[in-house]
């Protein structure tokens, strides 16, 4: 009986981190630029930055990386009509500017389904960045390009631990 409990606890120990969810951060109309938006103090901690974007809407936020950290950013939208039927030119434009000023435009190079069990929400992955990061503060800009509101999520980081957000 004790061995079975220890085995179950061991399995639970290894499975629990896989079931963790990104910490939500919701952007609103006050977060029009990265400087006005929140700062994710550690960009390796997993966050889900949410914004509803229509034509002309602008949102921004920042995150920091240290030396040798991995830059991990994913662009998702909620998989619902009519937003999931928009052409790439109608979807929100997302740019990531590194601390050296290099601008990366997230290109729509996939439409991979993802079911998030905690909220019961279906998403579509549209783009992912995964590369060696540069030490310093990154700036993310989000711009709506269609009259259809698009529930947009920028997932940052990969470590499922509690993180700090500064406004």
Predicted regions and their residues:
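Bacterial N-terminal signal peptides
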Residues: 3-14
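Contiguous segments within soluble domain cores/interaction surfaces
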Residues: 24-27, 75-115
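Hydrophobic beta-strand segments within beta-rich accessory/binding domains
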Residues: 60-85, 138-145
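Solvent-exposed loop and beta-edge segments used for protein-protein assembly and interaction
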Residues: 55-57, 65-67, 86-88, 118, ...
């Amino acid at each position: 009986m004790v061995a079975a409990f220890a085995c179950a606890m061991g399995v639970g120990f290894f499975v629990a981190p896989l079931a963790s969810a990104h910490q939500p951060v919701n952007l609103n109309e006050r977060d029009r630029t990265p400087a006005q938006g929140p700062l994710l103090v550690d960009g390796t901690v997993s966050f889900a930055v949410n914004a509803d974007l229509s034509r002309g809407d602008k949102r921004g936020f920042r995150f920091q990386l240290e030396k040798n950290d991995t830059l991990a950013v994913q662009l998702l939208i909620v998989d619902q009509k009519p937003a999931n039927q928009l052409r790439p030119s109608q979807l929100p434009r997302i740019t990531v500017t590194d601390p050296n000023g290099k601008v990366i435009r997230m290109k729509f190079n996939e439409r991979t389904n993802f079911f998030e069990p905690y909220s019961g929400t279906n998403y579509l992955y549209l783009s992912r960045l995964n590369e060696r990061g540069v030490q310093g503060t990154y700036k993310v800009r989000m711009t709506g390009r269609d009259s259809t509101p698009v529930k947009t999520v920028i997932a940052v980081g990969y470590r499922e631990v509690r993180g700090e957000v500064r406004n």
